[in-house]
């Protein structure tokens, strides 16, 4: 697992909207089955990461900057994302 970085205000907003902050979301990288899929992006390369924390599936959008994992957003996984993860 690499070094993480994120915007503190965005992390607080994510907690309010989705029930998880970016510090908690780092536990996704403890999932040995963690999936990473390249996401559509017009500026920097972004990736959709799908994994479990406990018994819940979560999806995160991340990018990589200077060797760090930058968290952009985290939410509960959609049905199709769970199917991809479980498949």
Predicted regions and their residues:
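Ribonuclease/tRNase effector modules and their secretory precursors
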Residues: 1-87
């Amino acid at each position: 697992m690499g070094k993480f970085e994120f915007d503190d205000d965005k992390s607080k907003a994510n907690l309010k909207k989705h029930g998880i902050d970016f510090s908690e979301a780092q536990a996704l990288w403890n999932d040995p089955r963690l999936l990473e899929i390249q996401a559509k992006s017009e500026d920097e390369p972004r990736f959709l990461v799908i994994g479990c924390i406990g018994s819940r599936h979560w999806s995160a959008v991340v990018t990589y900057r200077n060797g760090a994992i930058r968290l952009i957003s985290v939410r509960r996984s959609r049905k199709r994302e769970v199917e991809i993860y479980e498949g």
